[in-house]
Design a protein with these regions (language model features):
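Hydrophobic transmembrane alpha-helices and their membrane-interface boundaries in multi-pass
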Residues: 33-111, 117-124, 138-139
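The cytoplasmic-loop to transmembrane-helix boundary for the fourth helix
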Residues: 128-139
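Short functional linear motifs
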Residues: 28-29, 134
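Phenylalanine-focused residue identity feature
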Residues: 2, 13, 24, 98, ...
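Non-catalytic regulatory/interaction regions at protein termini and inter-domain linkers
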Residues: 1-28, 116
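Compositionally biased, intrinsically disordered low-complexity regions
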Residues: 22, 111-115, 132
């Protein structure tokens, strides 16, 4: 009974993971599935942040709300970019994250904690691009 109840949720997650991966070799599909799940989590969490901030003090937090919404839209579009190339989605996501961090740092200042996220963001390219593209990761 539990399997039947969980099946629709599992199917949704599998669909998200598989989106845009058709036609790629198995190793690439595995990496793109991971990227799709990461992008979906980014889209979901940034949407939640935007909603929370908008419901609190929208006028004060307006720039942060919009940065989060734009980042959510970009992250949600990552599976579509796999049709361009296997690295396009990762490049777009990493670039958007770094630009968003710059925006958060500009808004909150250096003491706001956003600069600490650059340490976390430095590890993301290893997951997104894999060790096969070490030059791209280092760049």
């Amino acid at each position: 009974m539990l399997k039947r109840a969980i099946a629709p949720v599992r199917n949704v997650f599998q669909s998200i993971a598989r989106a845009g991966t058709a036609g790629y070799p198995p190793d690439t599909v595995r990496r793109l599935k991971i990227l799709n799940v990461i992008a979906a989590l980014i889209a979901l969490t940034n949407s939640i942040y935007a909603l929370q901030l908008a419901m609190g003090d929208y006028e004060t937090m307006k720039p942060v709300v919009w940065i989060n919404l734009v980042l959510s839209a970009i992250a949600a579009s990552v599976p579509l970019t796999h049709r361009i190339s296997e690295t396009a989605g990762g490049l777009i996501l990493v670039t958007a994250e770094f630009v968003a961090l710059l925006g958060f740092t500009a808004y909150f200042g250096r003491s706001g904690g956003a600069p600490m996220q650059y340490l976390v963001a430095a590890a993301a390219p290893f997951v997104i691009f894999g060790l096969d593209r070490l030059r791209l990761v280092i760049a």
